[in-house]
Amino acid sequence: MKTLWRDLRDHIRVDFRPDLYAATALWLALLLSVNYYFDVEDSYIDSFQDDPRWPLLYLALYATAYYGSVWLWTHFHRRPDVWRNRDFWLRSGTALVFYSIYAGFYGHVVWSQQLFGGQVFAFLYYCLRNLQSLLTIVLPLYLFYKFADRQPSESTAPECPHRRTGTTADRPGNFYGMAPKRKGLVLYGLMLALMIPLITLASFQPDFLASYPTYKDTNANEFFGVPEWVTALIYELCYGWDFVPTELLFRGFLVIGMARVLGRGTVLPMVVWYCAIHFGRPPGETISSVFGGYLLGVLALSTRSIWGGLLIHVGIAWGMEIAAFLQKTGDQ
């Protein structure tokens, strides 16, 4: 745990520039203000649901957020060479295109209507909505990793923080941080444990119980002839899975993978884009994603693994589900 705190301190010491961080904060404030004042995502972008232009609008939003923050980093660090780097455009373009397809994907609606004659549409819709990332994010990134992401040799690889030759970070087997690492597990476990009392307190609030659990009784268990806990478990597994592609793309591909191009500069642009994917959420949650995204990004760069972020994200999500289930069960 001490090692990770030292890594975080070292990252801030090397990466922090008052002018860069202030400019990035202003850029974030502008994006947040425009989105929530004009309700850009909910009232405009989402009005194109089931329309081929829907993912294109997400692409415009995310590209603006990401490339704007990259420009700030290259400007203050005097790194115009980044914009002439083919690898930068290949990686950033891949991430932007496929995440925008994921955000604006609506094929699962059709699949849910067609499977089983649409008799369990609601259950299939909620499950397939969480699983569609297998096609839209995980598979494309895996193909990119296998066929486009050439591993640099030790003599030609650019300097990357915490890079140690001969480790799994240098071998093709580590798919953008998917290889588990012991480093940081104690810290991540502690961070998750600290959330338990907060989740417990939140579970007594009416607003919380109005949103959680996200699982809803759709009578799918009656259709399949199984106890309801079976359909609830299937849904919760699908729900938990949806955090995997988010961590894989943002902390894995955009931080660990992009470090070959930007080094420590991968974190800030990732944070801005990560904030933008929360624009449809309450403002407090969106703002908090900035701090969480920054911390998880630095730790992913340090550990060369996304498992810490997965542990925290999935743990909190399932913790809120369990707390809500217990509250509603106790009221019956």
Task: Identify the residue ranges that each predicted region occupies.
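Functionally important transmembrane alpha-helices
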Residues: V267-Q332
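Alpha-helical transmembrane segments in multi-pass membrane proteins
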Residues: D39-W71, D81-Q151
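Membrane-interfacial, low-structure loops and terminal tails that flank and connect transmembrane helices
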Residues: M1-V14, W73-L90, Q151-P180
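Membrane-interface helix/loop boundary segments of multi-pass membrane proteins
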Residues: A148, G166, G173-G189, S211, ...
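Membrane-embedded alpha-helical segments of multi-pass membrane proteins
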Residues: L56-T64, L131-L139, A232-L233, P245, ...
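Hydrophobic alpha-helical transmembrane segments
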Residues: Y21, W89, G93, L185-G189, ...
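Juxtamembrane helix-loop-helix connectors linking adjacent transmembrane helices
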Residues: G104-D242, G330-Q332
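Alpha-helical transmembrane segments
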Residues: D15-V34, R91-Y102, L190-M195
